[in-house]
Amino acid sequence: MLQLEQEFNDEVYSIVREQAGRLRLGISQKRACFFLPAVLAEYEAMWPEIDLVVRDGNLFDLNKMLKNGELDLLVLNRTPETEAMETELLFQEELLLAVPVRHPLNEKSVYDPDSRYRRLSPEVLNGETLILHTPFQSTRKIEDQILSTYKVTPGRIRVIRSIETSVQMVAEGLGITFVREGYTRNFHYSKPVNYYTLDIEHHKRDVIVAYKKGDSLPEYMRAMVELLKTHGENLLNNK
């Protein structure tokens, strides 16, 4: 009996110190596969007593889970819809243009002293074959906005859901595609592509962590946020 009482008191003490609990983390399947494993390994070494539950899936479902209180934290790209949540910036990434190595557009790129990438004007996409994503993917909304804003008329549009497949099609000379910078870090294909930034406003995109409006994060959740920030920056800087 005394042993049970001691265990109960120890658990209560841990909760008070915010060192025991559960963390339910949501993240898209695509971002999870190359970004999350290293974060989880470091977090569980730091907080072994936390019940860490990961939900990877599509952002439509994950957003609903966050609103319904089924998630504590959600990693996603900043959109107008995220204004209804508490958010913190994790890192910023470029929206890149992937171009075949032997494509004439490579000759039209210009040096950008403030970037690791050379730059292309969106107008050069007129008449080109573009590989766009499906309408329900967040990247497609950005693609459509760019084409509309800069009055780009593609010669042909291919629609592919898989980001890896899109980039591999570019490598084979089948078109040009848009891709988030973070996604390119773990692409492995026998043929290379060239990546460029676009000479547009807001060419960098915010990757954020969101949680319910009005919530304050306990220490063990705050630790996860800081790890996500660190590993995000390391990913983009090839560390």
Say what each PLM segment does.
Residues R22-G26, L74, I131, T177, ...:
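Short, well-ordered beta-strand segments
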Residues L105-E107, Y111-Y150, L217-V225, G232-L236:
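Secondary-structure junction motif
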Residues I15, A38-E42, L59-V101, N106-S109, ...:
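Short beta-strand-centered segments that line the small-molecule binding cleft or hinge
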Residues M1-A20, K229-E233:
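Alpha-helical "hinge/linker" immediately C-terminal to small N-terminal DNA-binding modules
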Residues N58-L62, K67-E70, L76-N77, S138-N194:
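Hydrophobic hinge/microswitch elements
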Residues A20-E83, K151, V159-I160:
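Central regulatory/effector-binding core of bacterial HTH transcription factors
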Residues E83-L89, E93, Y117, E164-K213:
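Beta-alpha-beta core module
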Residues F35, N194-N238:
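A late-sequence structural motif
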